Each structure stands twice: as C-alpha cells, then as structure tokens.
Amino acid sequence: MNSDNMIKDIWKELEEAHVPSVVKRAIDIPSCLKMFCTYKGQDGYYGIAFSFSEGINLDISPFQNLSEIEVSLFKDSSFPDSKFLLIQLVNRDCRVRDIFAAICGNIANTIQSVSSEREAVLLVVSQMRKWQDLFSKKMKTTLSVQEQQGLFGELSFFQKLICSSMDKVHAVKSWVGPNMNPQDFQSELWAVEVKTITANKFPNVLINSELQLDESTISKLYLYNMVVEILPVDGKTLPDLIDELRDILSQETYAANLFENKLLYSGYFDTDKDVYNERHYYIRKENYYLVQGEFPRIKKENLLLGVSNVKYSISLAVPTENIVEESNVLNTILSYEGNQ
C-alpha cells in the first residue's frame, strides 16, 4: 500500500471513532522521526503530526498564514522532553483532502531517507515552505490544457535523461521546471528549455523571459521543441507517461521520492487522472537547437536599463547550424555530468 492510501485509511478509522477532540495514530514507517495521522472530530480536520526532541528549535511563525492549513507547535504530553508539531487541513473539500494525503504521503516517504531526527524535521520544514503557492493556487483546479501540454513535454525529455546512462538522482535534480527556474532543466554546465506546441502553432514558440534563452552564464543551452497532435484516442496521455517514469524509477527510492515531490509542486495530482486521460498526445516532430550565434533570442545584456519580465515569440525557421541531433545533446550532458 502506498503512503497516501495508508494515511487516508488511518484518517477514516480515526473519523469513525467519533471522538470530538484531536486523536492521533502512529504511521508505521521506518523513520527516525515519529509521524502520526490526526483527526479533529468536532471540526472534521484531517492532519498529520510529528513528535521530536525539544532540543530541536522550530519557528512556525512563517506558516501561520498558510491557506487551507493550520500549524501548531506545543509540548508533547505523550513523550518526555518532546515537542508536537500538528498540521491540520481546514478545507473539507474531498479533492483537496486527497491532494493533502498525497503531500503527506510524500513527506512520509521522504523522511525515511535521512538518518537523524533533526534532518527529518528540516525536511518537513522544507516541504512546508513550498505549501503557500501550492495551496493557494495549484490545489484549487486541475492543470490547464497548456500546463498539461507543457508538463508532457518536460517529462518526455526527462524520460530521455533517465533512460540514458545519467545517474537517476542527478536527472531528477536537473528537472527544475517545478521550481520556476528560467529553464526547465539545468545543471552546473548545461540547461535545456522545453517548448511543446501543437502542429498548427509550428514554427512559433513563446519565450517567457529575457533569461530563458540567455546562454551567457552557462556552457551549453539547448532548446528542445516537441510538436504534438492532440487526439481523443491513440497516442499517450500524461498519466501514461508518468506511470512509465514511475516504473523506471521504482528501484531507486531516493530518486523516486524526489520525482514525486516535484510532480506535486508542478501541480500534478493522481486524483485528477480522469481529466488528464482525456487528452492523448501523438508526437509529430522533435528538434533540438543549440542556442548560440544567430539563434533568435533576447538576452538580458541587450535590454535597456529598467526593462524586465520580457515575453516574446520566436520562429524556429532558424539557420541549420543551430539544429543538433538528440544524441549530441545527450552525450554533451553526460560528458558534463561525468566531469562534475
């Protein structure tokens, strides 16, 4: 049973106990941090909690205004010299609850990878810092059609990375699209920006900032353009692709957990699968472009003082010397990763 289903099952059992105050039950995971499911009967609040040494300092003031979430920290009466961190979902919507369960399950998986209680608490806090944007925007609705298409493109390139000889953890870490970085994939010496467009839009693509195609600070910057056709049947759906990636990563626990974390913060939740299964993507064309020389782009250094947040469109009818083979791109990335 995966962690989010286990959490939902425990919540259901706690709810059926009909206790008005907060009740808790330990989650059975191999972790140095004690983790619990909680339920507050009088308000119908589902939650998770953590018990840890009172010697670990934790400031919850940055989390007091989280949308949909209530965070409390107090002395743990069940364990000596311990604190109790309680995180409760105050939104009763079923979809939001399922998403919260997925987030909690991801935390349960993640804290198993560290060897000290302090490290585990820091991991929990790190996840909480990301919740404001997630709960205020991405949990309210499913991904837009354009967001689904963009994610499909990013994950298609990600699949190429993890099917190469690249270390899978490094591959997952290089996917920085969910972090709102200028490019979708970035490491110390290379970056790849992915643009996924439908056939009727080719050859024009939208560039979202003056930094997106600015290669000034990196050794190699590539633009990967995927042209897709949207079909009611045939082709591959976004959930299909994600299931393939999960299967590839299944033997690498840390990489798999990191991938799930990034999926969540990209706004993808399994509870919305039925919506995403309505769109099938058939890949019509793929091209890679090395961003250099006469490749059409705006660079930050060319802007007048005070100009920023530039969005513009380019045509990919570019000189042939900018087009490179996929094998060239992957081999370059692998050579850089091997030399770091």
Task: Name what the model sees in each region.
Residues 1-180, 197-340:
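Nucleic-acid endonuclease domains
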Residues 161, 185-198:
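Conserved catalytic cores of phosphodiester-cleaving nucleases, focusing on short active-site segments
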